[in-house]
């Protein structure tokens, strides 16, 4: 336990805190530092952290940017926070950092240049409270062989449709039609909710983590037709999506 605490991990945990994607395959912030370094040809910029910190109003909150460009200007609510350029040192070789940004709700925007020319932008905005759910399957058609899967991403969103990054609402999934819930996940290494569904229950529950969760649908062998997946959460507008089994 002591060693885990030294590494910054809470225990018990079902997985490591390291890596560039979580248990669901959702990209962590660190994903983008590797993308920027390994794919310098891809125009990209990524701001971190998110900008939902009501308890930090007026406090210094450093902002980092991962980018394949070589210099960037950061704006908070339209006001420039200065320009940063990549260097050769350990600190500024892979990221650009604004150490003295004071948290104010609103919008962070970074404008990146490469070789003096416009390259990429990124924006993060303070969101409202959770208001609705959305579902997005990675595949809308799967084979009826009893093995094919559709991974469905669940997002908690505010009234303007923006994903709420700190939300952890309890989610309930219900499926009907020629497919079963193969498993659920939220990417939280400290959440020990059962992910697998060996009994093929048509209802499962899990909390959102950082505004996201995932449900995996598996086709039934020899069956075809339309599968309906619903997700509900107390106080939020529910969501529904369909997947076709052929």
Predicted regions and their residues:
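Substrate-binding clefts and catalytic carboxylate motifs of secreted carbohydrate-active enzymes
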Residues: 1-147, 159-160
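Short, hydrophobic beta-strand segments
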Residues: 96-103, 199-221
């Amino acid at each position: 336990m002591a060693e885990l605490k030294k590494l910054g991990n809470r225990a018990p945990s079902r997985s490591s805190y390291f890596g560039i994607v979580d248990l669901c395959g959702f990209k962590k912030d660190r994903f983008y530092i590797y993308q920027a370094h390994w794919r310098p040809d891809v125009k990209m910029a990524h701001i971190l952290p998110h900008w939902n910190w009501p308890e930090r109003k007026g406090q210094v909150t450093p902002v980092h940017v991962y980018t394949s460009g070589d210099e960037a200007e950061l704006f908070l609510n339209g006001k420039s926070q200065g320009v940063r350029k990549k260097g050769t040192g350990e600190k500024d070789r892979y990221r650009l950092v604004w150490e003295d940004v004071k948290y104010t709700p609103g919008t962070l925007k970074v404008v990146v240049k490469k070789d003096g020319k416009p390259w990429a932008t990124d924006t993060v905005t303070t969101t409202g409270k959770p208001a609705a759910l959305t579902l997005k399957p990675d595949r809308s058609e799967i084979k009826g062989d009893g093995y094919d899967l559709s991974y469905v991403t669940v997002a908690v969103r505010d009234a303007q449709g923006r994903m709420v990054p700190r939300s952890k609402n309890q989610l309930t999934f219900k499926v009907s039609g020629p497919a079963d819930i193969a498993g659920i996940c939220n990417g939280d290494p400290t959440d020990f909710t059962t992910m697998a569904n060996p009994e093929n229950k048509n209802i499962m529950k899990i909390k959102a983590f950082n505004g996201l969760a995932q449900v995996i649908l598996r086709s039934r062998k020899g069956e075809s037709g339309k599968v309906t997946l619903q997700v509900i959460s107390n106080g939020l507008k529910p969501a529904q999506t369909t997947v076709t089994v052929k």
